[in-house]
Amino acid sequence: MTKDGDEGSKSGVSRRKFLGSAAVGVATAGIASQLLTLSAPAEAAVKTNVGPSRAGVGYDVIVIGGGFAGVTAAREASRSGLKTLILEGRSRLGGRTFTSKLQNQKVELGGTWVHWTQPNVWTEIMHYGLEVEETVGLANPETVIWVTEDNVKRAPAAEAFEIFGSACNEYYKEARNIYPRPFEPFFERKKLQHVDGLSAADYLEKLPLTREQKDMMDSWLSGNGHNYPETIAYSEIMRWFALSNFNMPTMFDSIARYKIKTGTHSLLEAIMADGNSEVKLSTPVTKVNQDKDKVTVTTEDGVFTASAVIVAVPINTLHDIEYSPKLSAAKVDMGSQRHAGAGVKGYIRVKQNVGNVMTYAPARNKLTPFTSVFTDHVDESGTLLIAFSADPKLIDINDIKAVEKALQPLLPGVEVTASYGYDWNLDPFSKGTWCTYRPNQTTRYLTELQKREGRLFFAGSDMANGWRGFIDGAIENGREVGHQVATYLKRENDNA
Protein backbone atom coordinates (compact mmCIF):
# COMPACT_ATOMS: atom_id res chain seq x y z
CA MET A 1 0.00 0.00 0.00
CA THR A 2 1.11 3.56 -0.65
CA LYS A 3 0.51 6.76 1.28
CA ASP A 4 -2.40 7.85 -0.92
CA GLY A 5 -4.43 4.96 0.44
CA ASP A 6 -4.82 2.59 -2.51
CA GLU A 7 -4.66 -1.05 -1.54
CA GLY A 8 -4.83 -4.31 -3.47
CA SER A 9 -7.50 -6.87 -2.70
CA LYS A 10 -6.75 -9.87 -0.55
CA SER A 11 -7.19 -13.40 -1.75
CA GLY A 12 -8.81 -16.33 -0.03
CA VAL A 13 -7.68 -19.91 -0.48
CA SER A 14 -10.02 -20.94 -3.30
CA ARG A 15 -7.73 -21.73 -6.20
CA ARG A 16 -10.15 -20.63 -8.92
CA LYS A 17 -11.09 -17.48 -7.01
CA PHE A 18 -7.40 -16.76 -6.53
CA LEU A 19 -6.70 -17.01 -10.26
CA GLY A 20 -9.40 -14.49 -11.01
CA SER A 21 -8.53 -12.02 -8.27
CA ALA A 22 -6.47 -8.87 -8.42
CA ALA A 23 -4.07 -10.42 -5.92
CA VAL A 24 -2.42 -12.38 -8.69
CA GLY A 25 -1.31 -9.23 -10.45
CA VAL A 26 -0.78 -7.34 -7.19
CA ALA A 27 -1.23 -4.11 -9.14
CA THR A 28 -1.90 -1.14 -6.89
CA ALA A 29 -0.94 2.52 -6.95
CA GLY A 30 2.83 2.71 -6.80
CA ILE A 31 3.12 -1.08 -6.93
CA ALA A 32 3.69 -3.15 -10.03
CA SER A 33 4.42 -6.81 -10.61
CA GLN A 34 6.86 -8.50 -12.92
CA LEU A 35 5.02 -11.69 -13.75
CA LEU A 36 7.13 -14.30 -15.46
CA THR A 37 4.80 -15.63 -18.10
CA LEU A 38 6.59 -16.73 -21.27
CA SER A 39 9.53 -14.82 -22.69
CA ALA A 40 10.32 -14.85 -26.41
CA PRO A 41 13.02 -17.56 -25.99
CA ALA A 42 10.62 -19.67 -23.96
CA GLU A 43 7.91 -19.23 -26.60
CA ALA A 44 10.41 -20.40 -29.20
CA ALA A 45 11.14 -23.45 -27.06
CA VAL A 46 7.45 -24.35 -27.03
CA LYS A 47 7.22 -24.11 -30.81
CA THR A 48 10.16 -26.49 -31.32
CA ASN A 49 8.98 -29.12 -28.84
CA VAL A 50 9.39 -32.73 -29.97
CA GLY A 51 6.91 -35.58 -29.74
CA PRO A 52 6.82 -38.11 -26.88
CA SER A 53 9.25 -41.01 -27.04
CA ARG A 54 6.47 -43.61 -27.03
CA ALA A 55 2.88 -43.90 -28.20
CA GLY A 56 -0.15 -43.70 -25.95
CA VAL A 57 0.79 -40.57 -24.01
CA GLY A 58 0.76 -36.87 -24.79
CA TYR A 59 4.08 -36.18 -23.06
CA ASP A 60 7.07 -37.99 -21.70
CA VAL A 61 7.09 -35.87 -18.55
CA ILE A 62 4.58 -33.58 -16.89
CA VAL A 63 5.88 -31.25 -14.19
CA ILE A 64 3.28 -29.99 -11.73
CA GLY A 65 4.46 -26.64 -10.41
CA GLY A 66 6.48 -23.89 -12.07
CA GLY A 67 8.72 -22.71 -9.27
CA PHE A 68 12.50 -23.00 -9.45
CA ALA A 69 12.42 -26.74 -8.73
CA GLY A 70 9.80 -27.45 -11.38
CA VAL A 71 11.40 -25.26 -14.03
CA THR A 72 14.86 -26.74 -13.36
CA ALA A 73 13.53 -30.31 -13.46
CA ALA A 74 11.73 -29.52 -16.72
CA ARG A 75 14.92 -28.11 -18.22
CA GLU A 76 16.84 -31.27 -17.35
CA ALA A 77 14.12 -33.54 -18.73
CA SER A 78 13.62 -31.58 -21.95
CA ARG A 79 17.36 -31.34 -22.60
CA SER A 80 17.40 -35.13 -22.40
CA GLY A 81 15.08 -35.16 -25.42
CA LEU A 82 11.87 -35.76 -23.46
CA LYS A 83 8.68 -33.98 -24.40
CA THR A 84 7.93 -32.01 -21.24
CA LEU A 85 4.94 -30.01 -20.03
CA ILE A 86 4.84 -27.67 -17.03
CA LEU A 87 1.43 -27.18 -15.43
CA GLU A 88 1.36 -24.12 -13.18
CA GLY A 89 -1.66 -23.12 -11.14
CA ARG A 90 -0.79 -19.44 -10.93
CA SER A 91 -0.84 -16.99 -13.82
CA ARG A 92 2.95 -16.76 -13.58
CA LEU A 93 6.01 -18.92 -13.07
CA GLY A 94 8.30 -18.51 -10.08
CA GLY A 95 6.57 -20.26 -7.19
CA ARG A 96 7.52 -18.61 -3.91
CA THR A 97 9.79 -16.14 -5.66
CA PHE A 98 8.10 -12.99 -6.91
CA THR A 99 9.94 -10.00 -8.36
CA SER A 100 7.78 -6.88 -8.12
CA LYS A 101 8.10 -3.11 -7.79
CA LEU A 102 7.38 -0.61 -5.05
CA GLN A 103 7.41 3.03 -6.17
CA ASN A 104 9.47 2.09 -9.25
CA GLN A 105 12.03 0.13 -7.23
CA LYS A 106 12.53 -3.60 -7.64
CA VAL A 107 11.57 -5.69 -4.62
CA GLU A 108 11.53 -9.44 -4.02
CA LEU A 109 8.38 -10.52 -2.22
CA GLY A 110 9.56 -14.11 -1.85
CA GLY A 111 12.93 -15.84 -2.21
CA THR A 112 15.67 -13.26 -2.63
CA TRP A 113 19.23 -13.89 -1.50
CA VAL A 114 21.97 -16.02 -3.02
CA HIS A 115 25.60 -16.73 -2.18
CA TRP A 116 28.59 -18.76 -3.35
CA THR A 117 28.06 -21.08 -0.36
CA GLN A 118 24.93 -22.10 -2.29
CA PRO A 119 26.59 -24.04 -5.11
CA ASN A 120 23.55 -24.83 -7.22
CA VAL A 121 22.14 -21.35 -7.64
CA TRP A 122 25.59 -19.79 -7.85
CA THR A 123 26.53 -22.11 -10.72
CA GLU A 124 23.39 -21.04 -12.57
CA ILE A 125 24.09 -17.35 -11.95
CA MET A 126 27.60 -17.71 -13.36
CA HIS A 127 26.44 -19.88 -16.25
CA TYR A 128 23.88 -17.32 -17.40
CA GLY A 129 26.12 -14.32 -16.75
CA LEU A 130 23.89 -12.63 -14.18
CA GLU A 131 25.13 -9.97 -11.76
CA VAL A 132 24.44 -9.55 -8.06
CA GLU A 133 23.94 -6.51 -5.84
CA GLU A 134 23.96 -6.11 -2.07
CA THR A 135 21.48 -5.59 0.73
CA VAL A 136 23.47 -3.65 3.32
CA GLY A 137 21.48 -3.91 6.54
CA LEU A 138 21.61 -7.46 7.84
CA ALA A 139 25.16 -8.49 7.06
CA ASN A 140 26.93 -5.17 7.55
CA PRO A 141 24.91 -2.68 9.64
CA GLU A 142 26.34 0.43 11.25
CA THR A 143 23.80 0.60 14.07
CA VAL A 144 21.92 -2.17 15.88
CA ILE A 145 18.66 -1.60 17.76
CA TRP A 146 17.25 -4.35 19.94
CA VAL A 147 14.35 -5.04 22.27
CA THR A 148 15.01 -6.84 25.54
CA GLU A 149 12.56 -7.20 28.40
CA ASP A 150 10.36 -4.71 26.54
CA ASN A 151 13.01 -2.00 26.58
CA VAL A 152 14.77 -0.66 23.49
CA LYS A 153 18.55 -0.44 23.28
CA ARG A 154 20.71 1.08 20.56
CA ALA A 155 24.46 0.75 19.96
CA PRO A 156 27.10 0.68 17.25
CA ALA A 157 27.11 -2.68 15.50
CA ALA A 158 30.47 -3.74 16.95
CA GLU A 159 29.17 -3.29 20.50
CA ALA A 160 25.88 -5.07 19.85
CA PHE A 161 27.55 -7.97 18.10
CA GLU A 162 29.74 -8.62 21.12
CA ILE A 163 26.56 -9.47 22.99
CA PHE A 164 24.92 -11.31 20.11
CA GLY A 165 28.09 -13.02 18.91
CA SER A 166 28.86 -14.68 22.22
CA ALA A 167 25.26 -15.95 22.33
CA CYS A 168 25.63 -17.41 18.84
CA ASN A 169 28.87 -19.13 19.80
CA GLU A 170 27.02 -20.89 22.59
CA TYR A 171 23.93 -21.70 20.54
CA TYR A 172 25.73 -23.14 17.53
CA LYS A 173 28.44 -25.09 19.35
CA GLU A 174 26.99 -28.52 18.41
CA ALA A 175 26.38 -27.77 14.74
CA ARG A 176 29.51 -29.48 13.44
CA ASN A 177 28.71 -32.63 15.41
CA ILE A 178 25.18 -32.79 14.02
CA TYR A 179 25.91 -31.77 10.42
CA PRO A 180 29.62 -32.37 9.69
CA ARG A 181 28.64 -32.74 6.01
CA PRO A 182 25.66 -30.42 5.67
CA PHE A 183 24.66 -31.62 2.19
CA GLU A 184 24.48 -35.15 3.66
CA PRO A 185 21.97 -34.55 6.46
CA PHE A 186 22.00 -38.14 7.72
CA PHE A 187 25.78 -38.61 7.76
CA GLU A 188 25.58 -38.53 11.58
CA ARG A 189 22.10 -40.02 11.79
CA LYS A 190 22.17 -40.93 15.49
CA LYS A 191 23.30 -37.47 16.53
CA LEU A 192 20.62 -35.88 14.39
CA GLN A 193 17.96 -38.19 15.77
CA HIS A 194 19.03 -37.32 19.31
CA VAL A 195 18.28 -33.60 18.82
CA ASP A 196 15.62 -33.54 16.10
CA GLY A 197 12.78 -33.52 18.61
CA LEU A 198 14.02 -30.27 20.15
CA SER A 199 12.58 -26.94 19.12
CA ALA A 200 14.78 -23.90 18.63
CA ALA A 201 13.18 -22.45 21.78
CA ASP A 202 13.81 -25.61 23.83
CA TYR A 203 17.52 -25.43 23.19
CA LEU A 204 17.74 -21.69 23.72
CA GLU A 205 16.07 -21.73 27.13
CA LYS A 206 18.48 -24.27 28.61
CA LEU A 207 21.61 -22.30 27.66
CA PRO A 208 23.52 -20.20 30.22
CA LEU A 209 22.78 -16.89 28.49
CA THR A 210 21.51 -13.57 29.81
CA ARG A 211 17.92 -12.54 29.19
CA GLU A 212 19.23 -9.91 26.79
CA GLN A 213 21.11 -12.52 24.78
CA LYS A 214 18.11 -14.84 24.74
CA ASP A 215 15.89 -12.02 23.48
CA MET A 216 18.32 -11.29 20.65
CA MET A 217 18.57 -14.98 19.81
CA ASP A 218 14.78 -15.33 19.88
CA SER A 219 14.60 -12.62 17.21
CA TRP A 220 17.26 -14.35 15.14
CA LEU A 221 15.61 -17.77 15.39
CA SER A 222 12.22 -16.34 14.46
CA GLY A 223 13.76 -14.66 11.45
CA ASN A 224 15.44 -17.86 10.30
CA GLY A 225 12.37 -20.03 10.66
CA HIS A 226 9.71 -17.38 9.94
CA ASN A 227 7.60 -18.40 12.91
CA TYR A 228 7.75 -18.60 16.70
CA PRO A 229 10.90 -20.43 17.90
CA GLU A 230 8.89 -23.18 19.59
CA THR A 231 7.52 -24.24 16.17
CA ILE A 232 10.98 -24.46 14.56
CA ALA A 233 13.26 -27.49 14.81
CA TYR A 234 16.59 -26.82 16.51
CA SER A 235 18.15 -29.01 13.82
CA GLU A 236 16.94 -26.57 11.15
CA ILE A 237 18.83 -23.73 12.80
CA MET A 238 21.96 -25.89 12.96
CA ARG A 239 21.60 -26.77 9.28
CA TRP A 240 21.72 -23.14 8.11
CA PHE A 241 24.85 -22.55 10.19
CA ALA A 242 26.54 -25.71 8.93
CA LEU A 243 25.78 -24.78 5.33
CA SER A 244 27.41 -21.40 6.02
CA ASN A 245 30.72 -23.13 6.78
CA PHE A 246 30.07 -22.94 10.55
CA ASN A 247 30.78 -19.21 10.53
CA MET A 248 28.46 -16.39 11.61
CA PRO A 249 29.72 -13.64 9.24
CA THR A 250 29.43 -16.12 6.38
CA MET A 251 25.93 -17.00 7.52
CA PHE A 252 24.88 -13.34 7.51
CA ASP A 253 26.23 -13.02 3.98
CA SER A 254 24.72 -16.31 2.81
CA ILE A 255 21.15 -15.67 3.89
CA ALA A 256 20.58 -11.95 3.31
CA ARG A 257 23.31 -10.02 1.51
CA TYR A 258 23.56 -10.80 -2.20
CA LYS A 259 20.65 -10.78 -4.63
CA ILE A 260 20.33 -10.97 -8.40
CA LYS A 261 20.60 -7.46 -9.80
CA THR A 262 17.96 -7.97 -12.47
CA GLY A 263 15.64 -9.89 -10.14
CA THR A 264 15.05 -13.55 -9.40
CA HIS A 265 12.71 -13.68 -12.38
CA SER A 266 15.70 -13.17 -14.70
CA LEU A 267 17.34 -16.39 -13.52
CA LEU A 268 14.08 -18.29 -13.87
CA GLU A 269 13.63 -16.95 -17.38
CA ALA A 270 17.17 -17.99 -18.32
CA ILE A 271 16.53 -21.53 -17.09
CA MET A 272 13.24 -21.67 -18.99
CA ALA A 273 14.82 -20.45 -22.21
CA ASP A 274 17.59 -23.05 -21.87
CA GLY A 275 15.07 -25.89 -21.94
CA ASN A 276 12.43 -27.02 -24.38
CA SER A 277 9.29 -27.32 -22.28
CA GLU A 278 5.71 -26.46 -22.99
CA VAL A 279 4.01 -24.36 -20.31
CA LYS A 280 0.38 -23.99 -19.33
CA LEU A 281 -0.30 -21.25 -16.79
CA SER A 282 -3.47 -20.78 -14.70
CA THR A 283 -3.91 -24.54 -14.84
CA PRO A 284 -4.43 -25.98 -11.34
CA VAL A 285 -4.10 -29.75 -11.10
CA THR A 286 -6.91 -31.57 -9.28
CA LYS A 287 -6.13 -35.28 -9.79
CA VAL A 288 -3.15 -37.49 -10.58
CA ASN A 289 -3.99 -41.07 -11.53
CA GLN A 290 -1.23 -43.53 -12.38
CA ASP A 291 -1.50 -47.02 -13.81
CA LYS A 292 0.96 -49.52 -15.26
CA ASP A 293 1.72 -47.59 -18.48
CA LYS A 294 1.12 -43.93 -17.82
CA VAL A 295 0.00 -41.13 -15.54
CA THR A 296 -3.18 -39.16 -16.17
CA VAL A 297 -3.21 -35.61 -14.84
CA THR A 298 -6.57 -33.88 -14.53
CA THR A 299 -6.75 -30.10 -14.31
CA GLU A 300 -9.69 -27.76 -13.92
CA ASP A 301 -9.64 -27.27 -17.70
CA GLY A 302 -8.44 -30.53 -19.25
CA VAL A 303 -6.70 -33.90 -19.03
CA PHE A 304 -3.07 -34.69 -19.91
CA THR A 305 -1.11 -37.94 -20.01
CA ALA A 306 2.58 -38.72 -19.57
CA SER A 307 4.99 -41.55 -18.95
CA ALA A 308 6.14 -39.89 -15.72
CA VAL A 309 5.11 -36.97 -13.54
CA ILE A 310 7.23 -34.71 -11.35
CA VAL A 311 5.20 -33.23 -8.50
CA ALA A 312 6.99 -29.97 -7.68
CA VAL A 313 4.54 -28.22 -5.39
CA PRO A 314 5.14 -26.95 -1.84
CA ILE A 315 4.65 -29.52 0.92
CA ASN A 316 1.82 -27.46 2.39
CA THR A 317 -0.21 -27.91 -0.81
CA LEU A 318 0.66 -31.54 -1.56
CA HIS A 319 -2.65 -32.80 -0.18
CA ASP A 320 -4.71 -30.43 -2.34
CA ILE A 321 -4.25 -32.81 -5.26
CA GLU A 322 -6.11 -36.13 -5.30
CA TYR A 323 -3.78 -39.07 -6.00
CA SER A 324 -4.63 -42.57 -7.13
CA PRO A 325 -3.13 -44.72 -5.74
CA LYS A 326 -2.85 -42.63 -2.58
CA LEU A 327 0.53 -41.25 -1.60
CA SER A 328 2.61 -42.88 1.11
CA ALA A 329 1.58 -42.30 4.71
CA ALA A 330 4.71 -40.22 5.33
CA LYS A 331 3.90 -37.79 2.52
CA VAL A 332 0.30 -37.53 3.66
CA ASP A 333 1.36 -36.93 7.27
CA MET A 334 3.90 -34.26 6.38
CA GLY A 335 1.41 -32.54 4.11
CA SER A 336 -1.20 -32.40 6.85
CA GLN A 337 1.28 -31.25 9.52
CA ARG A 338 2.72 -28.60 7.19
CA HIS A 339 6.09 -26.99 7.63
CA ALA A 340 6.41 -24.03 9.99
CA GLY A 341 7.27 -21.14 7.65
CA ALA A 342 4.33 -18.75 7.89
CA GLY A 343 5.54 -15.28 8.87
CA VAL A 344 5.55 -11.85 7.26
CA LYS A 345 8.08 -10.24 4.93
CA GLY A 346 7.58 -6.72 3.67
CA TYR A 347 9.26 -3.68 2.15
CA ILE A 348 8.78 -0.34 3.88
CA ARG A 349 9.66 3.03 2.39
CA VAL A 350 10.31 5.72 5.01
CA LYS A 351 10.86 9.40 4.31
CA GLN A 352 13.87 9.76 6.60
CA ASN A 353 17.44 8.59 6.10
CA VAL A 354 17.70 6.21 9.06
CA GLY A 355 21.12 4.95 8.02
CA ASN A 356 22.30 1.39 7.79
CA VAL A 357 20.42 -0.25 10.65
CA MET A 358 19.48 -3.70 11.90
CA THR A 359 16.89 -4.40 14.60
CA TYR A 360 16.21 -7.42 16.81
CA ALA A 361 13.07 -8.09 18.85
CA PRO A 362 11.82 -11.37 20.33
CA ALA A 363 8.74 -12.78 18.63
CA ARG A 364 6.65 -12.16 21.73
CA ASN A 365 7.20 -8.65 23.01
CA LYS A 366 4.92 -5.75 23.91
CA LEU A 367 6.50 -3.08 21.72
CA THR A 368 6.50 -4.18 18.07
CA PRO A 369 5.33 -7.07 15.88
CA PHE A 370 8.57 -6.92 13.87
CA THR A 371 11.21 -9.46 14.88
CA SER A 372 13.71 -7.80 12.56
CA VAL A 373 13.95 -4.74 10.34
CA PHE A 374 17.00 -3.83 8.31
CA THR A 375 18.09 -1.38 5.65
CA ASP A 376 17.94 -2.45 2.04
CA HIS A 377 19.39 0.86 0.87
CA VAL A 378 19.32 4.61 1.40
CA ASP A 379 18.67 7.06 -1.44
CA GLU A 380 17.47 10.60 -2.07
CA SER A 381 13.88 9.58 -1.22
CA GLY A 382 14.75 8.21 2.21
CA THR A 383 15.27 4.59 3.23
CA LEU A 384 13.92 1.30 1.95
CA LEU A 385 13.62 -1.18 4.82
CA ILE A 386 12.93 -4.91 4.83
CA ALA A 387 10.85 -6.13 7.76
CA PHE A 388 9.93 -9.55 9.14
CA SER A 389 7.38 -10.77 11.67
CA ALA A 390 6.81 -14.24 13.06
CA ASP A 391 3.03 -14.01 12.86
CA PRO A 392 0.83 -12.48 10.12
CA LYS A 393 -1.94 -11.96 12.67
CA LEU A 394 0.20 -9.33 14.40
CA ILE A 395 0.66 -6.90 11.49
CA ASP A 396 -0.91 -6.10 8.13
CA ILE A 397 2.21 -5.20 6.18
CA ASN A 398 0.11 -3.34 3.59
CA ASP A 399 -1.46 -1.04 6.21
CA ILE A 400 0.73 2.08 6.29
CA LYS A 401 -0.64 3.40 9.57
CA ALA A 402 -0.18 0.08 11.35
CA VAL A 403 3.34 -0.31 9.97
CA GLU A 404 4.32 3.23 10.94
CA LYS A 405 3.06 2.63 14.47
CA ALA A 406 4.95 -0.68 14.69
CA LEU A 407 8.21 1.03 13.69
CA GLN A 408 8.05 3.85 16.26
CA PRO A 409 9.61 1.95 19.21
CA LEU A 410 12.53 1.00 16.97
CA LEU A 411 12.88 4.11 14.80
CA PRO A 412 11.09 6.97 16.56
CA GLY A 413 9.64 9.62 14.29
CA VAL A 414 9.89 7.76 10.99
CA GLU A 415 7.18 8.47 8.43
CA VAL A 416 6.13 5.59 6.23
CA THR A 417 5.26 6.52 2.65
CA ALA A 418 4.71 2.99 1.34
CA SER A 419 4.59 -0.55 2.66
CA TYR A 420 4.18 -3.69 0.62
CA GLY A 421 4.17 -7.42 1.20
CA TYR A 422 2.59 -10.57 -0.15
CA ASP A 423 0.71 -12.98 2.10
CA TRP A 424 1.96 -16.37 0.99
CA ASN A 425 -0.29 -18.02 3.57
CA LEU A 426 -3.37 -16.85 1.64
CA ASP A 427 -1.95 -18.01 -1.68
CA PRO A 428 -3.57 -21.43 -2.32
CA PHE A 429 -0.52 -22.54 -4.30
CA SER A 430 1.90 -22.05 -1.39
CA LYS A 431 -0.05 -21.88 1.91
CA GLY A 432 3.10 -20.73 3.66
CA THR A 433 6.44 -19.02 3.19
CA TRP A 434 9.87 -20.64 2.94
CA CYS A 435 10.11 -24.20 4.22
CA THR A 436 11.16 -24.63 7.84
CA TYR A 437 10.81 -28.07 9.38
CA ARG A 438 9.18 -28.52 12.75
CA PRO A 439 10.71 -30.76 15.44
CA ASN A 440 11.06 -34.40 14.28
CA GLN A 441 10.12 -33.68 10.67
CA THR A 442 13.63 -34.08 9.27
CA THR A 443 14.20 -37.58 10.63
CA ARG A 444 10.63 -38.75 10.09
CA TYR A 445 9.86 -37.38 6.66
CA LEU A 446 12.74 -36.00 4.59
CA THR A 447 13.86 -39.31 3.08
CA GLU A 448 10.27 -40.40 2.45
CA LEU A 449 9.39 -37.12 0.76
CA GLN A 450 12.18 -37.68 -1.75
CA LYS A 451 11.11 -41.22 -2.70
CA ARG A 452 9.59 -42.01 -6.07
CA GLU A 453 6.16 -43.65 -6.02
CA GLY A 454 5.67 -45.62 -9.21
CA ARG A 455 5.73 -43.12 -12.06
CA LEU A 456 5.52 -40.16 -9.68
CA PHE A 457 8.67 -38.26 -8.75
CA PHE A 458 8.79 -35.46 -6.20
CA ALA A 459 10.86 -32.29 -6.27
CA GLY A 460 11.07 -29.00 -4.46
CA SER A 461 13.03 -26.75 -2.20
CA ASP A 462 10.97 -28.24 0.65
CA MET A 463 12.71 -31.59 0.30
CA ALA A 464 16.26 -30.56 -0.59
CA ASN A 465 19.16 -31.99 1.37
CA GLY A 466 21.14 -28.75 1.48
CA TRP A 467 19.69 -25.24 1.37
CA ARG A 468 16.11 -26.34 1.96
CA GLY A 469 13.78 -23.35 1.80
CA PHE A 470 16.12 -21.42 -0.50
CA ILE A 471 16.33 -21.01 -4.27
CA ASP A 472 19.49 -23.11 -4.09
CA GLY A 473 17.59 -26.02 -2.57
CA ALA A 474 14.96 -25.84 -5.30
CA ILE A 475 17.59 -25.98 -8.03
CA GLU A 476 19.51 -28.74 -6.23
CA ASN A 477 16.47 -30.96 -5.98
CA GLY A 478 14.98 -30.04 -9.34
CA ARG A 479 18.17 -30.89 -11.18
CA GLU A 480 18.51 -34.22 -9.37
CA VAL A 481 14.93 -35.26 -10.00
CA GLY A 482 14.99 -34.16 -13.64
CA HIS A 483 18.00 -36.42 -14.15
CA GLN A 484 16.32 -39.29 -12.27
CA VAL A 485 13.26 -39.11 -14.51
CA ALA A 486 15.35 -39.04 -17.67
CA THR A 487 17.31 -42.08 -16.49
CA TYR A 488 14.13 -43.92 -15.50
CA LEU A 489 12.43 -43.37 -18.85
CA LYS A 490 15.55 -44.20 -20.85
CA ARG A 491 15.85 -47.51 -19.02
CA GLU A 492 12.16 -48.21 -19.57
CA ASN A 493 12.37 -47.43 -23.29
CA ASP A 494 15.55 -49.47 -23.68
CA ASN A 495 13.80 -52.46 -22.13
CA ALA A 496 10.59 -52.07 -24.13
UniProtKB/Swiss-Prot annotation:
Chief place where the protein resides: periplasm
Pfam annotation, one family: Amino_oxidase
SUPFAM superfamilies associated with the record: FAD/NAD(P)-binding domain
Comment on bound cofactor: Binds 1 FAD per subunit.
Compartments where found: Periplasm
Cofactor needs: FAD
UniProt keyword list: Alkaloid metabolism, FAD, Flavoprotein, Oxidoreductase, Periplasm, Signal
PROSITE patterns for the chain: TAT (PS51318)
GO cellular component: periplasmic space
InterPro entries named in the record: Amino_oxidase, FAD/NAD-bd_sf, Flavin_amine_oxidase, Flavin_MAO, TAT_signal, TAT_signal_bac_arc
pH-dependent activity: Optimum pH is 8.5.
Catalyzed reaction equations: pseudooxynicotine + 2 Fe(III)-[cytochrome c] + H2O = 4-oxo-4-(pyridin-3-yl)butanal + methylamine + 2 Fe(II)-[cytochrome c] + 2 H(+)
Disruption phenotype: Deletion mutant can degrade nicotine, but it cannot further degrade N-methylmyosime and use nicotine as the sole carbon and nitrogen source.
PTM remark: Predicted to be exported by the Tat system. The position of the signal peptide cleavage has not been experimentally proven.
Induction of the gene: Expression is up-regulated in the presence of nicotine.
One GO biological process term: nicotine catabolic process
Regulation of this protein's activity per its record: Strongly inhibited by Na(2)MoO(4) and FeCl(3). Activity is nearly twice as high in the presence of Na(2)WO(4).
A molecular-function term among this protein's GO annotations: oxidoreductase activity
Amino acids binding FAD: A69, E88, R96, W113, V285, S461, I471
Function: Involved in nicotine degradation. Catalyzes the deamination of pseudooxynicotine to 3-succinoylsemialdehyde-pyridine. Functions as a dehydrogenase that uses the c-type cytochrome protein CycN as the physiological electron acceptor. O(2) is a poor electron acceptor. Pnao is oxidized by CycN 230 times faster than O(2) at equivalent oxidant concentrations.
Cited NCBIfam families: TAT_signal_seq
Family: Belongs to the flavin monoamine oxidase family.
Protein name: Pseudooxynicotine dehydrogenase
Organism encoding this protein: Pseudomonas putida (strain DSM 28022 / S16)
This protein's encoding gene: pnao
